[in-house]
Amino acid sequence: MKIVCYKDKILKAINSVVKAVASKTTMPILEGILIQTNDNEIKLTTYDLEIGIEYIMDCEVEEQGSTVVNAIMFSEIIRKLPDTEIKIYLDTNNLLVIECEGSLYKLATMDPTEFPELPKINVENSIQIEQNVLKNMIRRTIFAVSNEENRPIFTGCLFCLLYTSPSPRDA
């Protein structure tokens, strides 16, 4: 695997997926980011067995491949690099090498085949909604959500889809 991308693009992707990294787990693979290449894009995936996030971004892919790297260490290194082009590749010892303007970092990797697959989503019963509409809906109802973990049923929001017809004859 060998990719070249700009810091701001990959940092945005990392910041998006790092929210689903397991903090306390007996499975070290869940503390990592799965990095996969496909043509001229990379896919970053995190999954803590409850929440999973995938982020696909365009970048220059020189060699195909995949790996898993510790999310916290990877994000901290990328965050501290200058705002320029970054080379990320696997060396012969299966270490993830990060190069940027004379800086060189090497991180241990994990076997990507051990990373759990995200569950398949049934797109048959899905809807599309604009981001600002969803945010507004959540903002107007979140005050009623409980912070107490002893009654987990009250710590979430129910999404209920109702179908309405504009025609009075359908009623």
Task: Mark where each language-model region is.
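Intrinsic, low-complexity N-terminal interaction/targeting segments
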Residues: 4, 8-28, 104-159
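Short, structured motif recognition centered on aromatic/hydrophobic residues
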Residues: 10, 35, 42-44, 74, ...
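A cross-kingdom feature marking solvent-exposed beta-strand/loop segments within repeated
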Residues: 20, 55-79, 149
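Short, glycine/charge-rich beta-strand/loop segments that flank catalytic centers
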Residues: 32, 86-102, 153-159
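N-terminal glycine-rich anion-binding loops that anchor highly charged ligand groups
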Residues: 38-52
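A structural feature that tracks compact, well-ordered secondary-structure segments
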Residues: 45, 77-79, 86, 137-143, ...
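Short, surface-exposed beta-strand-loop junctions and turns on beta-sheet-rich folds
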Residues: 49-53, 59-61, 104-106
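Single conserved hydrophobic/aromatic residue that forms the stacking wall/gate
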Residues: 163-171
